[in-house]
Amino acid sequence: MSKKPVMLMILDGFGIAPKSEGNAVTLAKKPNLDKLFEKYPTSQLQASGLAVGLPEGQMGNSEVGHLNIGSGRIVYQELTRITKAIADGDFFENESLKLAMTNAKKTGSSLHLMGLLSDGGVHSHIEHLRGLLEFAKKEEVQNVYVHAFMDGRDVPPSSGQEFIEKTEKMMAEVGVGKIATVSGRYYAMDRDNRWERVELAYNALVLGKGETASSATQAIEKSYHDNKTDEFVLPTVVTENGNPTANIKNGDSVIFFNFRPDRAREITRAINDKEFAGFKRETLDLTFVTMTQYDKTLERVNVAYTPQTLSNTLGEYVSNKGLNQLRIAETEKYAHVTFFFNGGVEKENPGEDRKVIPSPKVATYDLKPEMSAYEVTDELLNRLDSDKYDMVILNFANPDMVGHTGVVEAAVKAIETVDECVGKIADKILEKNGCLFITADHGNAETMIDFSTGNPYTAHTTHEVPFVWVANDTEGKKLSNGKLADIAPTMLVQLGLEVPTEMTGENLIVNK
């Protein structure tokens, strides 16, 4: 018997904004999306700030977006959780953080604070570094070193100097800390098993080897001189009298202050895992603390803020009702439609199939804006013909990953590629008398020029995202505006299921 699948398609980084020369969404020729937006009920969803459990005015991101969509409720984000703990003072009583402080103090070893130096709020926040410096001062830790990972993606591409200055000022005010290394996130925060990049960051952090500079400021200046923006700063060791200021040694304490897991795992494994095989290196004996749980299977790490458990997420609930579901994406967004969508749970639910299509191996995605969208589409169409699935969750990575490059023409091509794929998928779902919801997790590709400077804008945005309901039975109905947390309840109603009490989102389908 033919199933009537209820499908959610997430166009990653596809926000709503007025037409402009920096809006790849409106510049793109997208006949399929235009037709669907015109013919079927559409509304707008909030995907940033308080509506997704982030601080007010904070841009959304993929992790947060998928958590909110998949759980059907506003999820209190780690950024907000940690910021609140610092403000309340609970932060300074955190047992795992205290463990790192005590070890460094008791043994006279060093305390290393490593993480993304930015106020982007996607992977980290510079105010959390301030909290750690204040904690170290309070605990009278003498040798405190900062290993700065430079951003340039969630903040402007060349804003690194400003964050270095901010950190230097912060350390002077608090009275503790020195910057020991500077590395672009391209190296220190890879998530695609490109161990040759990670190794360069590791060498700077642990061996004190790599590019050298007499100060963090000089490291950034040197990088800009070589036309490398923050993200691509080669791992650089800051020296004093020709020697490394500090490197991570046996017996030291390390606190990794990134709170988002996906780009923190590889360097953490490289430093800690005994069985690590990415490249040759010594295993150190450290007191290593991660701000949040990066991965349950990580060895020899302490977690400062353990995960909040979310029950009755969309995937779990549908599984408990005996329905089959498919999660499909390419590598770059696979964790988002699985781990994050399931509320931070790695294991799949019974009846949940997963398919990852490898992302292309290119240095930056403007070189191949199609990414693996066609392959994802072909795989999905084949699977829809199996009539196995009641629910399908798909993510197209293109608008976000190409949007991050700042190359408008490439982002336009990315969206045109996705539009072709949308057309084929919508036809197939309608043919099966199913229903397709199209949305995004946050904005990005709709704002690619910073008009105050004329420079490329590579970060996410606070714009609303579209919500479209494509089905054969939409006559006389419309969609209300809402937030990402309203998607799951809306889908459950289409699946003919009750909405569980844990889901505080609302069904957005209303009669006209």
From Swiss-Prot:
Binds 2 manganese ions per subunit. Coiled coil: none annotated. Substrate binds at residues 123, 153-154, 185, 191, 260-263, 333. GO terms for cellular component: cytosol. Mn(2+) 2 binds at residues 12, 62, 441-442. Pathway: Carbohydrate degradation; glycolysis; pyruvate from D-glyceraldehyde 3-phosphate: step 3/5. One of its GO terms (molecular function) is phosphoglycerate mutase activity. The active site is at 62 (phosphoserine intermediate). CDD domains: iPGM. Its EC number is 5.4.2.12. Keywords: Glycolysis, Isomerase, Manganese, Metal-binding. It catalyses: (2R)-2-phosphoglycerate = (2R)-3-phosphoglycerate. SUPFAM superfamilies: 2,3-Bisphosphoglycerate-independent phosphoglycerate mutase, substrate-binding domain, Alkaline phosphatase-like. One of its GO terms (biological process) is glycolytic process. Pfam families: iPGM_N, Metalloenzyme. It is an enzyme of class 5 (isomerase). It comes from the Bacteria. Mn(2+) 1 binds at residues 400, 404, 460. Its cofactor is Mn(2+). NCBIfam families: pgm_bpd_ind. Monomer. Catalyzes the interconversion of 2-phosphoglycerate and 3-phosphoglycerate. Belongs to the BPG-independent phosphoglycerate mutase family. This is 2,3-bisphosphoglycerate-independent phosphoglycerate mutase. It comes from Clostridium beijerinckii (strain ATCC 51743 / NCIMB 8052).
